[in-house]
Amino acid sequence: MMVTSSSIPIGQILYHDPFFFVKREIFYFFLIFLLSFILLRIPMSFWEKNSNLILIISIFLLTIVLLIGKSVHGSYRWINIGILHIQPAEICKISSFFYISNYLSRKTNEVRNNFWGFLKPITIIIIQSVLLLAEPDLGTVIVLFLTTLSVLFLSGVKIKQFFIIIFFVTLIITALVLFEPYRIKRILSFWNPWKDPFGNGYQLTQSLIALGRGHFFGQGLGNSIQKLNYLPEAHSDFIFSIIGEELGYIGCFLILLMIFFISFRAMYIGQQSFEKKQVFSGFLACSIGLWFSFQTLINIGAVTGILPTKGLTLPLISYGGSSLIVNLMAICILLRIDFEIRLSEHQAFPKGI
């Protein structure tokens, strides 16, 4: 609904078809809908056994996109295969969490008691991060590190090791910002977007105007002014601004409530998995919940001016084929984990009892 409303003007301008983007979104939705019948029948043991292979494939795609990828706004993030536009960074997220969950399910004691055991999964994330930064895609790198560190923390890593990694990651991110002029401009415009409202601060000021126009109940669905080619990426990274303008703060609250309900539900499913000794599923469910939470917080932070812009979509809401497919794939996996929990409870009781 919101993709339709926010993408009509840009679809008309770029493709002379106001419903261009929503048609593509519907296509991707039906694609994952058909795939869901397969995904829901794949046991978690399959993902656990093949997590390393999936990780290798994602790293291969991250490498290929730098060679043959399509450039959009100076970033090489998409591989075009016919009508499909694949974004390897989205695949990288879920593949990383497969790997981390598998690693922790096998080597929890090593991670807790040995610094090298703790460093191994971090090394894999660093390799992926180097490829992601070459695109460049700092937003995905931040989500990967935040989620990975949080899952490692849940696994019982020593606080000392945890803070050592946080310290070095902070130094690296600071260096990445300082050595890239466009990132410095983003930081400066984030601090005071109104100082340059028609330059570096343009996108943020237009976003804030959209949110300000919405007030509590919004201007009404379809009545946004900012989507009329004023706010860049109104249908993708900044769709939350259009939600605020059209549906008001009430609409924003309901959207956040929905996303965080899914996140907390994922964490609860993870807890149940641990209780049933399904360790891989437990770590994976927690990873998905944390991933959705962190990406949502970063997106909302960028839209409202609390954080610099990172180019991250709002999970399950923003336009984006790869993002939608991977997010719904994660939902299917959560449903499968929940199914296996219920199945184990049913099998725990003999018939007639």
Curated annotation (Swiss-Prot):
- Keyword Magnesium part of the UniProt annotation: no
Name the Pfam families for this protein. FTSW_RODA_SPOVE (PF01098)
- Compartment(s): Cell inner membrane
Give the reaction(s) catalysed. [GlcNAc-(1->4)-Mur2Ac(oyl-L-Ala-gamma-D-Glu-L-Lys-D-Ala-D-Ala)](n)-di-trans,octa-cis-undecaprenyl diphosphate + beta-D-GlcNAc-(1->4)-Mur2Ac(oyl-L-Ala-gamma-D-Glu-L-Lys-D-Ala-D-Ala)-di-trans,octa-cis-undecaprenyl diphosphate = [GlcNAc-(1->4)-Mur2Ac(oyl-L-Ala-gamma-D-Glu-L-Lys-D-Ala-D-Ala)](n+1)-di-trans,octa-cis-undecaprenyl diphosphate + di-trans,octa-cis-undecaprenyl diphosphate + H(+)
Q: Which EC numbers characterise this protein's activity in its record?
A: 2.4.99.28
Where is it found, in Gene Ontology cellular component terms? cell division site; plasma membrane
For this protein, the record's PROSITE patterns field holds: FTSW_RODA_SPOVE (PS00428)
As one GO molecular function, the record gives:
peptidoglycan glycosyltransferase activity
Q: Which family does it belong to?
A: Belongs to the SEDS family. FtsW subfamily.
What is this protein's name? Probable peptidoglycan glycosyltransferase FtsW
User: What is the species of this protein?
Assistant: Buchnera aphidicola subsp. Schizaphis graminum (strain Sg)
